[in-house]
Amino acid sequence: GFSFGRIRGKGSTVASTGRPAPGAVNVLQLYSDAIARVTQAGMRPGANMGVLPIDHPDIEQFIDCKQTEGSITNFNISVAVTDQFMHNIIHGDRPDSGRQFIWDKIIDGAWRNGEPGILFMDTINNGALHVEPIEATNPCGEVPLRPYEACVLGSINLAAHVNGDGFVDWAELAASARTMLRLLDHVIEKQASPIPEIEAEQKRYRKIGVGVMGYADMLIKMGYEYGSEAALDLAENVMHYVQDISYNESMH
């Protein structure tokens, strides 16, 4: 992920040249065009997250930059909002502040094509005040990351953890969660990082993501209707279980 918050607003004067700055969105487009020429393993196109703070001068253009289908195709985009901004929106703001207008644009864009997303930066940094602040996330937004930090992700196939009687095999699920955690931690040691800074930060914080897949198939095997109360309760119980097992294993 990239935070474009330090890029000066479009049209502001660059002191060293006397020329107007291109702005955050033009730099975002430049990055997207460059990444379009790079693939992962020769097949998968590059993916990134572009983040801009809610108070940046280019925020309106940023919110609208993907409304045209096919533009900036190699980035998801998210607006970094603060607790103060949300407080003002929830509790009413001055009509002339412009905040409600910006908020309405975010909501409209999310309704039209799912972008921009929202990152609650104060919440993200609430437990990380002793180290450098987090400004961005990985491409899908599930893992907030510091500069040069990386996170290894893996998923447990839930459908493979339903026994022949149509019940969750909790013991087998626990074993898989423990194995997944160890596996991902070993990947940090064994994988090759593109630059030394990434390797150093990854081994410093050792972030991993133990996720799941196959939830819908699990429901089919268990005879649960998707979206039912039973299905929602199952999802909550499974994730609490995987989380608890993973946390306990990480302390050993």
Region locations from a protein language model:
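Glycine-rich and small/hydrophobic secondary-structure elements
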Residues: 18-36, 230-247
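A short alpha->loop->secondary-structure connector
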Residues: 67-75
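Gly/Pro-rich turn-and-neighbor structural signature
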Residues: 60, 91-109, 113-118, 238-252
